[in-house]
């Protein structure tokens, strides 16, 4: 639950998207970035539905809506009036979260949407890196080698689903040290 005056004071609104696709992403980011304090509950109060017949991951228009959510996060940070240091921290945090969201989306979208989705992902990260708002070093080692490979060759194989498929992929891309970092993160 949110106080309306808090949302209004910080210009926090849901981004309008087809079928409310991914709307929670930028809303939650903005709320957490603007909040001075928060209370979290351990019991679930939302029933999160995914992968139904008209799911975001099955529609070309909706599959790319996640990209609009991350663009909205960056727009909001830029317009926030925060000092440059705070903007930099929040921008990097959004771009780290974006990697995870994009990869989550990638494995769920229809196969025919995967190549165009990775192309957009690669273009967005190339721009962020060239503008200096993001560095591959901001990512964990296995994510870093994976994103580097996506930007290098969109058609290179991505990790097979499941822990073993990803482990083999990270070993191939980054060697034993990257595999070890990935496995340590999964404990």
At which residue positions do the language-model features occur?
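Solvent-exposed aromatic/hydrophobic patches embedded in short alpha-helical segments
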Residues: 1-2, 30-31, 94-102
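Catalytic core of nucleotide-sugar-dependent glycosyltransferases
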Residues: 43-51, 57-84, 98-131
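Gram-positive cell-envelope targeting signals
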Residues: 12, 35, 40, 55-56, ...
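Residue-level signal for alpha-helical context at structural boundaries
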Residues: 25, 49, 91-92, 139
């Amino acid at each position: 639950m949110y106080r309306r005056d808090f949302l209004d004071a910080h210009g926090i609104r849901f981004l309008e998207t087809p079928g409310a696709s991914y709307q929670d992403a930028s809303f939650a980011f903005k709320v957490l970035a603007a909040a001075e304090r928060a209370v979290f509950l351990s019991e679930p109060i939302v029933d999160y539905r995914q992968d139904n017949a008209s799911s975001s991951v099955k529609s070309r228009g909706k599959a790319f809506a996640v990209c609009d959510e991350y663009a909205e996060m960056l727009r909001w940070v830029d317009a926030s009036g925060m000092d440059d240091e705070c903007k930099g921290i929040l921008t990097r945090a959004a771009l780290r979260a974006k990697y995870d969201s994009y990869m989550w989306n990638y494995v769920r979208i229809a196969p025919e949407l995967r190549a165009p989705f990775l192309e957009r992902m690669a273009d967005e990260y190339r721009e962020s890196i060239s503008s200096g708002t993001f560095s591959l070093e901001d990512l964990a080692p296995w994510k870093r080698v994976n994103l580097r490979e996506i930007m290098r060759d969109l058609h290179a194989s991505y990790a097979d689903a499941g822990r073993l498929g990803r482990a083999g992929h990270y070993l191939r891309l980054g060697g034993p040290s990257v595999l070890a970092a990935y496995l340590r993160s999964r404990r």
